[in-house]
Amino acid sequence: NYYSNSIAFGNAFIGWNYKVLTENLHTCTLAEGCDYVADKIHDEADREVVSVLDKILTESGYTRKKGDFNEGPSVRYYCGKSSVYDYALNSDTGNLYLELRIRNAEKCLAYLRECPESIVEVFRHSDAGCQNRMNGTCRYGVKYEFEKEEKWHCGCCGAPFKLHPIKEDIPHYLKLLELGRSK
C-alpha cells in the first residue's frame, strides 16, 4: 500500500495526485522519474513540459533525483557528480515551476534580447533575500544590474531564478543556464 503512514507523511502531497481519482486513496500509486512531479500537475501542457525537459536533460547526461521542497514535490537535475542541482521542476500545489541555478546573471543579459518577455520579466524581478543577506553572510545570492537598477535573487533555499516554464521556451532556459552557470 503506497498510502501507508510512512509514505503519506514522506509525501504529503498525494492529495494533488489525479491518480487518487482513477485508483483510490489506499492503492494510489506514486510515480517514479519525472512523473513524480508531473502527476501532481493539473494542466496537460505543463505535464508535457515536464516530460520534454526531463528527456532533454537526461539525454544530455544530467542525473535526476527526487526532492521535496517546502511547497511540494520536485525533481532535481544534477550535472556530473555535483552536489548542487542546476535545474529543478517543482509542483507548488499543482502549479509547475522551473528553477534555474544561474550564478552569474550578468553573463545572461545580452542574450535576453532573444528571449520572450516572460523570461525577461524574471530578470526584472528582485527579491529582498533572506536573513543571510540581512546579516551579511549570504554566499548564494545573485546580484546584477538590469535596466539601470540593481537586482537580487536569493539562492539560499533554492535556485535563484524561478519561473513557470513554457515548452516553446525550453531552448532559452537551457541557453541561459549555459551562459550563467558559473561565476
Give the label of every model feature segment:
Residues 5-86, 92-95, 125:
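Charge-rich, low-complexity N-terminal segments
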Residues 68-160, 168-183:
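Short, conserved beta-strand/beta-arch hydrophobic-aromatic motifs that form part
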Residues 53, 163-165:
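Phosphate-binding beta-loop-alpha motif at adenosine-nucleotide cofactor sites
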